[in-house]
Each structure stands twice: as structure tokens, then as C-alpha cells.
Amino acid sequence: MSKSSYYAPHGGHPAQTELLTDRAMFTEAYAVIPKGVMRDIVTSHLPFWDNMRMWVIARPLSGFAETFSQYIVELAPNGGSDKPEQDPNAEAVLFVVEGELSLTLQGQVHAMQPGGYAFIPPGADYKVRNTTGQYTRFHWIRKHYQKVDGVPLPEAFVTNEQDIQPLVMPDTEGRWSTTRFVDMSDMRHDMHVNIVNFEPGGVIPFAETHVMEHGLYVLEGKAVYRLNQDWVEVEAGDFMWLRAFCPQACYSGGPGRFRYLLYKDVNRHMRLTLNAPH
């Protein structure tokens, strides 16, 4: 497996001499948040956290993508929280893109490196801390877990993408693969957070149009991505946010790999009332 890279924003502030024209856009079907707009002045903070800031790149939004939130969290040395989550119904995935994250999950300590992935079920006891002298940056994806009578809660686990063999899509000669952290047939899970990998020349050869909402954070490389009726150039550090049924396709022209972290909601009946809880 090729050595992977993981883009992480560092903030900063543009000079007064820079042009304000950028690729940022928000439409009725999708949004593109390019890396150039993730600056210091748009960060947020949370109660019970020390030495942290975060970029909120997705949140439940009525009439758009409604099922998940996604943060990019930056921890300064000694930053973290002993009480990171206040919602007892929230499940989460943590994915480390820079530095080292010390995760204490149900009493067990894990030193998570870049590529590190943790699934945290609702109600789980956990703490996060940056115990190093360098900055740590990670994605925190949260969803209200949809319980089903007779289906147990999924178990917590911690792994690293380097320990998982990507599954190659058929008839692609290895140019399109997916690193899956959860078995697709495991009905305990109502969301998947995967990594999609394209080698140069790899494509999504049709306009995917489906019910699953998406958050796509580009970890590495660049490509041209079709969103609804638009072809958009994207690169490492960009985020694409798609509502249900937004058509999408991709062409990865190189010169290197194109990879993104992908959220989608799965394995549950569709709600039949608009204001029912997710």
C-alpha cells in the first residue's frame, strides 16, 4: 500500500492584498467549502474543552443534509476534554489527520496516529487529549443514533486505515477502491465513514443519485467532481457537502492519488414524518 497523506487546515489570515475570489459555493443541492476559507476567524469553541478550536464544516440543516455534523478539531499541546460529548444519543467517528491523539475509550488508552480511526457508540465514556508538544488535528463526525428494537448497539473500536485492505471496485483494474471500517452487512451501524481511493485515471463512471447524504473531505490529491449539474475542481483540504439525491461523479486525472473521507447514512427505514427525530 502506498504511503498515505492527510491534509489538515492550519488557519491563518489572508493578506489585504489577496483576491477574494474563491471556489466556495452553496447551492440547493450541495456546498463546497474549499481549504482557503478555513481561517482563524471562522473557528468555534466548545464547553469543557481546553486549548482547542474547530472548524464546523457540516451540521444538520433543514431542507439540506439533515443527519450529521462534522468538525475539524485542532488541539494545542495539553488540549483536550474529559467531557467531550453532552448528547447521550450521539455516536461518533474520530479520524486523525495530523499529530497524535490520546483517546481514553471505556477505560482503555489508545495513541492514535494519522490515519487513526475510532468508532464511539452513543453513551460511551471517552476522553481525548493531546499529550505531545505538537498540534493535533482530527475529524469528529457525529450523528444521532437511530435505535432499532432487537438490534444491539454497535461496539466501540479503534483502528488505523493502514491496517485495512481496501476493497477494489469491479472492472476498475484497481483504480477505484474503498477502505471500509465497518462490515456493510452489520445492521447495528446506521452510518458509515469510509475512505474512497482513486488512482490516476480512476472515475465514478455514472452520476450516482441516491438517498444517502454525504460529507466528503479530500485527504489527498485533486480531481474534477460532478455535483448536481456542475463540474467542480477540488483538492486536498476541500470539503463537499451533499444533500440526498444530489447527482455525483468523479474523474481523477492525477498526477497522484485522489482520496477522501466519506460519511453516509445507511441501514435504516426512511422517516415518514418530516419532524421525526433522526
Segments from the language model and where they lie:
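Short acidic-glycine-tyrosine-enriched beta hairpin
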Residues: G107-P122, Q229-A244
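N-terminal intrinsically disordered, low-complexity, charge/repeat-rich segments that act as generic
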Residues: S4, L101, G107, G116-R129
